[in-house]
From Swiss-Prot:
tr-type G domain span: 2-184
Catalytic activity: GTP + H2O = GDP + phosphate + H(+)
Binding residues for GTP: D14, H15, G16, K17, S18, T19, N131, K132, M133, D134
Pfam families per record: EFG_C (PF00679), GTP_EFTU (PF00009), GTP_EFTU_D2 (PF03144), LepA_C (PF06421)
A biological process from GO: positive regulation of translation
Organism from which the protein derives: Pseudomonas syringae pv. tomato (strain ATCC BAA-871 / DC3000)
Membrane topology: Peripheral membrane protein
Keyword Membrane annotated: yes
Protein name: Elongation factor 4
Length: 595
């Protein structure tokens, strides 16, 4: 036990977590030269393409330290993106320590601060590491000062290394073995194991990644899942080094996988406790708080035949990504689909892309919305996540929108732009701290504004230097209205938006203009209108294509020409009454990209 170290790596996006993980694997001989490739742990295609870590990955390595003892290192590479904080908090629950990796050129960023606080709250030992020391712009002294000022942990003897060139990595491992405490637990006690993550394998059933707190588990044991009360027979146990490798057993303090032929997708939920069937009254370990989705959007299969496949794909994905929630919904314009809850826009894009790639589905997404709290005149409070479910305005006493507390870290020279952006998004400044060359501003912003494009805009006004971390704070009354889009006088439910009254005219105009570009021209005029209640606030028309019916007339009598034109006009009028307009997929997403 005293030779085991469990730790995870926390850092902001692009500060070199995954590269550092590669170096660890290389130094401890986890893979042969041939199998070694950049970012070994980012195994999903999507992760490699976007260069981000989405899922937390676990690896077990054996490191022979300078004192001659071989240590077993179980480490978990975690995502750095604000949308995946949940993955991080789960990984931390399985560890005794964390490496805080900071880019020595860029300094501390908002995301590392947030994840670091999570680690300190869970009582982990945090060890700062300065990465990218081989870069010319590295400034270790300034960064150490920032770590002390912003996060408040002692960084005077932070290890300096460069994961790319491999400089100082052995020093990191030595320091790690010395500072991070070994796990506590009793091998002889009854089995108690926490499920950190699980995924579905078509051949093996549910594979669970577990951290064993007490006792041991081996092949052939009967295990009991505490929340479902079901018994399963263990087929195999083992660790990732980084490949699957089976071991005899998993003992207290270790992190590894258990395969027990569970075929039911909800058979081993994340955050659950496993024990042996002989000791069913073991205490349940404190799991993780269920995270509430912040953004909701409708996902619909393009062809309605795919609906069942889509449901199955969602079930399998929910197992692997427990922060995704979904419920069936139907729309007049799009047929049957699901209303899904996500943690943020990036999460939504990733899920949609994973569904399309891994399960070969064609999907249409509607504009994302947040949850609104409504107080009805009857005195009851309801929560609405879908604009088309909004009750009549006359029945509503008060509408409240979710407000987030956003912490933004930005270099001083970009501060003005960031403040302008926050004001434009109806933000209220809460506090401002000057820390060295950086400023930490905190704002209360309506989540509705943050969800759509705030992150991208923030990056562009600050040339990529600002970083953002936000969390839900409260609901607050606001003057909100529902903006409907009518195409040829018919409401399209999938295009409705809930907006602030002050922005409603502007949003309506922008939306109709955008739709005009995207809806293809028909043989008749198509009117696109934006309405608040019964009042039309904006209108554009997609002009009809018309055939020149007078082409064959040459000279001739005006009454002949008039007859042909009247006939064309009558035809167009008839067409307009029965014609319906196909709305392309881009039009539904136009709502996202309103400047």
């Amino acid at each position: 036990m005293s030779h085991i170290r469990n730790f995870s790596i926390i850092a902001h996006i692009d500060h070199g977590k995954s590269t550092l993980a590669d170096r660890f694997i290389q130094m401890c001989g986890g893979l042969s030269e041939r199998e070694m490739e950049a970012q070994v742990l980012d195994s999903m295609d999507l992760e490699r393409e976007r260069g981000i870590t989405i899922k937390a990955h676990s690896v077990t390595l054996y490191y022979k330290a300078k004192d001659g003892i071989t240590y077993q290192l179980n480490f978990i590479d975690t995502p750095g993106h604000v949308d995946f904080t949940y993955e991080v908090s789960r990984s931390l629950a399985a560890c005794e320590g964390a490496l805080l990796v900071v880019d020595a050129g860029q300094g501390v960023e908002a995301q590392s601060v947030a994840n670091c606080y999570t680690a300190i709250e869970q009582g982990l030992e945090v060890m700062p590491v300065l990465n990218k020391m081989d870069l010319p712009q590295a400034d270790p002294d300034r960064v150490k000062e920032e770590i002390e000022k912003i996060i408040g942990i002692d960084a005077t003897d932070a290890v300096a290394c460069s994961a790319k060139s491999g400089m100082g990595v052995d020093e990191v491992l030595e320091r790690l073995v010395a500072t991070i405490p070994p796990p506590t637990g009793d091998i002889e006690a009854p089995l108690q194991a926490l499920i950190i993550d699980s995924w579905f394998d078509n051949y093996l059933g549910v594979v669970s990644l577990v951290r064993v707190r007490h006792g041991r588990v081996k092949k052939g044991d009967k295990i009991l899942v505490k929340s479902t009360g079901k018994l399963h027979l263990v087929d195999s146990v083992g660790v990732f080094n980084p490949k699957h490798s089976a071991t005899v057993d998993l003992k207290a303090g270790e992190v590894g996988f258990i395969i027990a032929g569970i075929k039911d997708i909800h058979g081993a939920p994340v955050g659950d406790t496993l024990t042996l069937s002989t000791t069913p009254d073991v205490d349940v370990l404190p799991g993780f708080k269920r995270i509430q989705p912040q953004v909701y959007a409708g996902l619909f299969p393009v062809s309605s035949d795919d609906f069942e496949d889509f449901r199955e794909a969602l079930q399998k994905l929910t197992l692997n990504d427990s922060s995704l929630q979904y419920s069936p919904e139907s729309s007049d314009a799009l047929g049957f689909g699901f209303r899904c809850g996500f943690l943020g826009m990036l999460h939504m894009e990733i899920i949609q892309e994973r569904l399309e790639r891994e399960y070969n589905l064609d999907l249409i997404t509607t504009a994302p919305t947040v949850i609104f709290e409504l107080l009805l005149k009857t005195g009851e409070t309801i929560y609405v996540d879908n604009p088309s479910k909004l009750p009549d305005l006359s029945a509503i006493e008060d509408m409240r929108e979710p407000i987030v507390r956003a912490n933004i870290l930005v270099p001083q020279e970009h501060l003005g732009n960031v403040i302008t952006l926050c004001i434009e998004k109806r933000g209220v400044q809460h506090d401002m701290l000057f820390l060295g060359t950086q400023v930490q501003v905190s704002y209360d912003l309506p989540m509705n504004e943050v969800v759509l494009d705030f992150f991208d805009r923030l990056k562009s006004v600050s040339r990529g230097y600002a970083s953002l971390d936000y969390h839900f704070d409260r609901y607050q009354s606001a003057n909100l209205v529902k903006l409907d889009v009518l195409i040829n006088g018919e409401k399209v439910d999938a295009l409705a938006l809930i907006v602030h009254r002050d922005n409603a005219h502007y949003k309506g105009r922008a939306l109709t203009e955008k739709m005009k570009e995207l809806i293809p021209r028909q043989m008749f005029d198509v009117a696109i209108q934006a309405a608040i209640g019964g009042q039309i606030v904006a209108r554009t028309t997609v002009k009809a294509l018309r055939k020149n019916v007078l082409a064959k007339c040459y000279g001739g009598d005006v009454s002949r020409k008039r007859k042909l034109l009247e006939k064309q006009k009558a035809g167009k009028k008839r067409m307009k009454q029965v014609g319906n307009v196909e709305i392309p997929q881009e039009a539904f997403l136009a709502v996202l990209r309103l400047e």
